[in-house]
């Protein structure tokens, strides 16, 4: 992981997303170890409060302080209430979680307070309206734009003035290979571009997007994403048409 982090930082990647349960609870310690040799101001670190582990109000402080230690940092640039839905919204209110995170922000331990989301647009509207959030993380890609309410969720965030952090832009890797027919449509439009890069660019082309997350398991995937974003251009009208044509036969 240290070599991967070094390659990312050296090539302009500066937003690193982790969470308490990722990789068998080892993601935060691994990332903390890998990042500690770099100046703290050279990267943005995002982690998340594990909502489903909270059994009482005091657990908020317990997990938050533990996460700072695990990541070997004094503050999180972005801190999210993890996987918010209707049930966890009730917990958020009952345990006064936003108020506690706002206190940590006053203390300089959090720079920006947000949440990641997995529920309906109606629930998203309710959560956005309840507190002065600064950003939100949603699943968005060119399949889920209509199929899974991503368009409606994106527009809710836009209306509330909340920048969107995009997760699953390549839909768990599914949009890295669309099958022979759709792949050929995209290759005719741009012979050099990887199929996955179309998905990354689709998400990054939206104006209210703060950053696009991408889970990468190989240096080749990292290199492809670096190239895509280093040379980034929003999708043109012709490219959008090619993507629509590919989707028709997907």
Residue ranges and their predicted role:
Residues 7-9, 13-14, 33-35, 130-132, ...:
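Structured C-terminal cap/extension of enzyme domains
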Residues 22, 37-61, 82:
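Structural motif corresponding to the early beta-alpha repeats
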Residues 10, 52-170, 180-184, 190-191, ...:
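Glycine/proline-rich, positively charged
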Residues 17-18, 47, 166:
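Hydrophobic residues in well-ordered beta-strands that form the structural core
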Residues 1-43, 74, 100, 106:
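N-terminal binding-site loop/beta-alpha segment at the start of enzyme catalytic domains
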Residues 43-45, 113, 164, 212:
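Hydrophobic/aromatic residues located in beta-strands of well-ordered beta-sheets
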Residues 22, 26, 118-119, 217:
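Short beta->alpha linker loops
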Residues 15-22, 111-115, 137-138, 211-213:
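Short catalytic-loop micro-motif centered on adjacent basic/acidic residues
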């Amino acid at each position: 992981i240290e070599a991967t982090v070094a390659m990312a930082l050296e090539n302009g990647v500066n937003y690193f997303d982790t969470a308490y349960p990722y990789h068998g609870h080892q993601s935060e310690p691994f990332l903390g170890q890998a990042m500690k040799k770099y100046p703290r101001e050279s990267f943005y670190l995002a982690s998340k409060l594990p909502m489903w582990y909270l059994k009482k109000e005091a657990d908020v402080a317990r997990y938050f302080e533990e996460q700072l230690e695990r990541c070997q940092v004094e503050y999180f640039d972005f801190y999210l209430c993890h996987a918010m839905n209707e049930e966890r919204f009730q917990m958020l209110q009952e345990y006064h979680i936003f108020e506690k995170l706002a206190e940590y922000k006053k203390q300089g331990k959090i720079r920006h307070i947000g949440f990641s989301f997995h529920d309906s647009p109606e629930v998203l509207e309710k959560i956005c309206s309840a507190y002065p959030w600064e950003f939100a993380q949603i699943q968005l890609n060119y399949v889920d734009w209509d199929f899974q309410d991503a368009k409606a969720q994106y527009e809710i965030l836009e209306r509330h003035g909340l920048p969107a952090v995009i997760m699953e832009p390549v839909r768990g890797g599914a949009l890295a290979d669309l099958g022979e027919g759709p792949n050929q449509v995209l290759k005719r439009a741009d012979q050099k571009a990887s199929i996955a890069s179309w998905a990354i660019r689709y998400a990054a082309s939206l104006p209210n997007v703060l950053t696009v997350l991408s889970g990468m398991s190989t240096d080749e995937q990292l290199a492809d994403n670096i190239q895509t974003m280093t040379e980034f251009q929003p999708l043109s009208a012709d490219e959008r048409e090619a993507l629509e044509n590919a989707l028709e036969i997907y």
